[in-house]
């Protein structure tokens, strides 16, 4: 009878040790996931601040364009600018706007490619980690 008890207690200890190791691995995995989530959140915050900054810059630029155009209209109304000067000013405004929009489009394309790559990597990572026991 004493042999059975000692075998049983050894089996119980081994089972507890295995459970503890499993819990420890699960905890380490969760700690890693929390760290990754915090890093991801920081990146999202940085991107949000960048977008807000770009929006503010864009709105300021649009206000500048509006005032430049309204200044041209005022000069035309008061006959203070010739048609050729008005055309030149208007073409400069259009050229600057197109350059700015092209740069913004290029940046957004680059960001979209980066985001797509990150999404694919994250999907692959979480698909592989969820299939692990």
Swiss-Prot record:
Species for this entry: Schizosaccharomyces pombe (strain 972 / ATCC 24843)
Gene Ontology cellular component list: cytoplasm; meiotic spindle pole body
Protein name, UniProt field: Sporulation-specific protein 2
Main location: cytoplasm
Family the entry assigns: Belongs to the VPS13 family.
Cytoplasm keyword on record: yes
Name of the gene: spo2
Subunit structure of this chain's protein: Interacts with spo13 and spo15.
Function: Involved in sporulation. Plays a significant role in modification of the spindle pole body prior to spore formation and is required for initiating forespore membrane formation. Assists in the localization of spo13 to the outer surface of the SPB.
Cell compartments where the protein resides: Cytoplasm, Cytoskeleton, Microtubule organizing center, Spindle pole body
Keywords: Cytoplasm, Cytoskeleton, Meiosis, Sporulation
Induction statement: Induced during meiosis by the transcription factor mei4. Protein levels rapidly increase during meiosis and then decline.
General remark: The sequence is 100 percent identical to the C-terminus of vps13b.
Example of a GO biological process term: ascospore-type prospore-specific spindle pole body remodeling
């Amino acid at each position: 009878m004493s042999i059975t008890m000692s075998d049983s207690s050894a089996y119980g200890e081994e089972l507890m040790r295995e459970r503890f190791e499993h819990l420890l691995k699960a905890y380490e995995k969760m700690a890693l996931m929390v760290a990754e989530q915090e890093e991801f959140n920081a990146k999202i915050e940085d991107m949000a601040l960048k977008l807000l900054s770009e929006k503010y810059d864009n709105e300021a630029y649009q206000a500048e364009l509006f005032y430049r155009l309204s200044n041209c209209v005022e000069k035309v109304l008061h006959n203070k600018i010739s048609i050729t000067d008005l055309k030149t000013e208007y073409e400069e405004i259009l050229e600057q706007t197109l350059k700015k929009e092209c740069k913004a489009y290029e940046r957004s394309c680059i960001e979209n490619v980066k985001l797509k790559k990150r999404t694919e990597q994250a999907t692959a990572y979480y698909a592989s980690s969820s299939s692990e026991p």
